[in-house]
């Protein structure tokens, strides 16, 4: 009853309607946002006493940028739940170390009703250093009771939980979908495993990390490159407010990554400055070949980056890889 929760995502989104039920069940009050999702509007709504809020990373990137520019703080907020896509480390660090707000990373899908993992600390994590705990917070957490996860290669062979081997992520549980309404056939396999469409690793403690969506993984010269790793590395640059990495056709390597960035309004770093910054966090061969500047990256209705619309936008610009010209 002491909590006031503000779900930022729309109520048609899995996280939106789940909070709409769980908040009153626990006795918490709610702040219901309107259509204006601008950083200024979000800040003003949060200042109505919100203690907990939840949204996708892109929402918090824009809010943090606004807070910094306006020299503002969040007076009542205690916890931020982040899901929908991978959360950049820079967002976690800024919330926790600059504003004293705890970040809770989670993952789920409508097909999972919706929770799949939650990044609460297991006892062994409390003994780790602050840096090691941040590494854990970057994962999407471990599955709750009744949810099972596994990762496999393309041939369906189970992969080890070593935190290093990426594979197709499968989920199974009492609240995991078997078929869509009126579809007529099961979408889960014979053992009730549901293909989430994500690529992930799972470590020995059961903490899962999304490395990409299957459709967004960049395949260059037969090797996989995670667009999420590139995006998180780019957003760590102090002059970059948002980033999206995609693969574009290349005459030799089939695909090569490029990164599209939105910069803070007053600053626009050189391309090599951004690429050199990214190279500190990824292998040399994974560093994007080009940087494209945009005023805005397309988003879906729930605030996630829309790679489909972004590719169309680049096509409309007649963009091709520099080595394909």
Name what the model sees in each region.
Residues 314-325:
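Acidic/polar alpha-helix N-cap and adjacent early helical turns
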């Amino acid at each position: 009853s002491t909590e006031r929760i503000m779900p930022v995502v729309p109520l048609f989104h899995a996280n939106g309607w789940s909070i709409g039920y769980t908040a009153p069940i626990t006795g918490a009050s709610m702040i219901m946002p309107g259509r204006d999702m601008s950083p200024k509007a979000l800040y003003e709504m949060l200042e109505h006493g919100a203690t907990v809020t939840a949204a996708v990373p892109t929402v918090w990137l824009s809010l943090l940028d606004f807070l910094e520019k306006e020299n503002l703080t969040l007076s009542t907020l205690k916890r931020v739940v982040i899901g929908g896509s991978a959360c950049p480390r820079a967002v976690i660090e800024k919330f926790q170390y600059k504003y004293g707000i705890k970040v809770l990373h989670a993952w789920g899908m409508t097909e999972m009703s919706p929770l799949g993992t939650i990044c609460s600390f297991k006892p062994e994590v409390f003994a780790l250093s602050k840096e090691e705990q941040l590494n854990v917070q970057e994962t999407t957490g471990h599955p709750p009771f009744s949810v099972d996860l596994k990762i496999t290669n393309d041939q369906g062979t189970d992969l080890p939980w070593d935190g290093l081997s990426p594979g197709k992520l499968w989920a199974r549980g009492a609240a995991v979908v078997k078929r869509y309404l009126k579809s007529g056939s099961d979408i889960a396999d014979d053992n009730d495993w549901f293909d989430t469409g994500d690529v992930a690793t799972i470590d020995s403690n059961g903490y899962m990390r999304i490395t990409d969506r299957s459709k967004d993984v960049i395949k260059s010269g037969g090797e996989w490159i995670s667009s999420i790793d590139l995006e998180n590395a780019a957003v760590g640059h102090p002059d970059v407010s948002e980033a999206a990495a995609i693969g574009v056709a290349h005459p030799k390597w089939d695909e090569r990554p490029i990164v599209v960035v939105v910069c803070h309004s007053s600053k626009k770093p050189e391309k090599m400055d951004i690429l050199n910054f990214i190279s500190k966090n990824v292998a040399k061969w994974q560093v994007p070949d080009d940087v494209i500047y945009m005023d805005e990256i397309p988003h879906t209705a729930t605030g996630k980056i829309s790679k489909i619309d972004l590719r169309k936008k680049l096509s409309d610009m007649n963009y091709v890889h520099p080595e394909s010209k």
